[in-house]
Every structure is written in structure tokens, then in C-alpha cells.
Amino acid sequence: MDIPPLAGRTVAMSLGALPVSYVLNQVSAFSQPLCVVLTSALVLGLLFMAVYSLSHGEITYDPLYAVFVVFSFTSVVDLVIALQEDGYLMGLMDFYAKEGEPYLRTAHGIFICYWDGTVHYLLYLTMAGAIRKRKRYRNLGLYWLGSFAMSLLVFLPGNILGKYSSEIRPTFFLAILYMLVPCWAGMRIFNQSPAPSSCTCDVVQEEQKKSLLQRPADLTLIVYLILAAFFTVFRGLVVLDCPADACFIYIYQYEPYLRDPVAYPKLQMLMYLFYALPFYCLAAYALTFPGCSWLPDWALVFAGAIGQAQFSHMGASMHLRTPFTYRVPEDTWATFLLSNLLFALGPHLLALRCLWRPAFFLRAAPPSSPQDQGKKQQ
């Protein structure tokens, strides 16, 4: 399989975050929040100008190239912050974690940084490499879009509503501008033409004639979607303070992190309740009735969103930065990990199913009329 190479120029620019972080950390003036936000904007502006001057051809071909290069730089910064907060690095991003975005020092913030510095970073390099080679990256872009949007939709409101709301810095308003990026990038990615399907009309018609019992993989996914929907409703009721005994036992013995006043876990469960739950129902419908051509794209977006959300939620639930009373008890680790890993795995299996065997979701060609058949015979 021909995999797009990682863009070497993008790697070099992104790794420039290391010396830049070290130099800025040595300047005492950056102990002021206003200096931090102005410097951050200046660095990103200079980086964008450098990308534009060095890669004008790529940006002309696809403006998202500049976004991926700049964001790869910020991904390295996020990875440095996460490693520094966990004690693996020292003296690189102290000023930003203290005066820029102190909520990145929470357990949830640390795992957002880990995800951005690893998964997002590899996606940026791969998509930038695909643009340089003029190859398709639509599927990777959809996965990134869901992941990036989910992290913002939980993290930014959580900073305002949680116990760290009093520590909002001017840099927070710079982060709000990031919300415009997935909107614009999403429109461009969705407007890209999908890869041409190799399924013939006969294959599509034959696949769509099969009943659900003749498609055991789809039947298994539907059962999973139903169970995941019930689990989503249950955890939504838990964070909404449902007085049922089952909710009380769950929040104290299995996921006490849902009570943490940082607000991120509550917002995450509400995001699941209001957005993931409808998708589970619609996806089960699309696996039952043929021709739902929207599912393959949205399954990728949803897989990215759930992957990022579950990684951050599971990591923060067990991280030492979370107060002991809100951490998962050691005797329930197995149940917690199994249920949450399955919750994260299912959407990825759904996306893979849609990519590998898309015939069931394609719109069947209308049957040819007798006149058309007569013309073909002539």
C-alpha cells in the first residue's frame, strides 16, 4: 500500500518548537499573562509567514497545508507541556503552563496534550505529506476533524464552568479562535471528492438485498450500538444526579471522577448524551436499511471524537493529578478499563466496516427501463 510520506519540512518546522520554548522560558518578562498571549500570537504569525514563503505551491494547491504545519508546531508544544507536567522534562514550558493556560496542568489537560502531541501530530505530518505528493487524505482529515472538535467542545467550556474558571488568562481568548479552524477545515474536507468506489452496480444490489441475519458483522455492530446507547444514557443520568441506587453505586465505586469539580467529566458525559446517543441510533438505522451514504464519512468523524474523548477521560480518571477521592478505586480498575475501552473501540470498528465494505451504504443505481435495455441490445 502506498502510504503518503511524512513531510520532512513539516517535521523540521514543528521541532523548532523545542528551542523556541526553551528560549522563551528563560525570559523573565513572560511571567505576565499579557506578554504570554502577545508572544504566542507573534510566534504563530511568524511561523505562518515562514510556511507561506517556503511552501507557496502547497498552500496554493490546498490552504489546509499551512494549518497542518502550524498545528504540528503547537502539537510539539503540547507534548512538551504534558511531559513536563509529568516530570519527564524540565525548563521548557513553565511560563506557559503557569501564566498562559494553567488549566493544562489538570489531569484532563495533560491527556489532551498527550493526544495532541502524538495522534494529532502524526495526522498533521501524514496529511501534509499527502498534500505535497498530491494524494488524498480525506479519511484522515475526517478522523482529525472529529477528534479536534471534541477536544475543544469539552475543554474550552470546562475551563469556564469548572473550578479553574477564576484562572482564565488572555491566552484563553486566543484558544477560542481555534474553534473557527475546524469549521473552515471541515467544510473543505467534506467538499473534497471521496475516493472512487470499486463496487459495481451488481455488487451493490447483491449486498443490499441481504437481510440483517445474512450480515453477522452488521448485526454485531447493531447490538454494540444499542448497548453503547444504554451506557451513554446511564452515565448521562449519573452526572445529572439521578437518585437511583445504581447511579449512586456507579459514581462512588466505579467512576468517582464524574464528581470532580473540574467539570470536564460532566461535560464529556453530556456531550455523549446529546450528540453520541443520536448518532448511535442513526448508525443502527443505517446498518439496517441500505443506501445511507452519509454513514461512512460521519463514522470516521465520530470515531475520532470518541477516541480522543475516551483517551482523555480514562487517563484523567486514573492520573495522580486527579485528587485521590475522585480517582478510580484499584479494585474496580478492570471493570472501568474494560467498559471504557469497549466504548472507544466500537466506533473505530464501525468506521473500518464502512471503509472496507462500503457497498451496502452506496446508493443503488436506478433499474434500467425496457427502452434502455433495447437500445443496449441494438
Swiss-Prot record:
Query: PROSITE patterns per the record?
Result: EXPERA
Gene name linked to the record? Tm6sf2
Highest taxon, organism lineage: Eukaryota
Record's Gene Ontology CC terms? Answer: endoplasmic reticulum membrane; endoplasmic reticulum-Golgi intermediate compartment membrane
Residues covered by the EXPERA domain: 61-186, 217-351
Protein task:
Regulator of liver fat metabolism influencing triglyceride secretion and hepatic lipid droplet content. May function as sterol isomerase.
Write out the similarity annotation: Belongs to the TM6SF family.
Indicate how the chain sits in the lipid bilayer: Multi-pass membrane protein
Name used for this protein in its record: Transmembrane 6 superfamily member 2
Supply one GO BP term: regulation of lipid metabolic process
Q: List locations, semicolon-separated.
A: Endoplasmic reticulum membrane; Endoplasmic reticulum-Golgi intermediate compartment membrane
Name the Gene Ontology molecular function terms of this record. identical protein binding
Bilayer-crossing regions: 34-54, 63-83, 110-130, 140-160, 170-190, 219-239, 269-289, 291-311, 332-352
| Keywords for this protein | Endoplasmic reticulum, Membrane, Repeat, Transmembrane, Transmembrane helix
Q: Which Pfam families match?
A: EBP (PF05241)
Where, if anywhere, are coiled coils annotated?
A: none
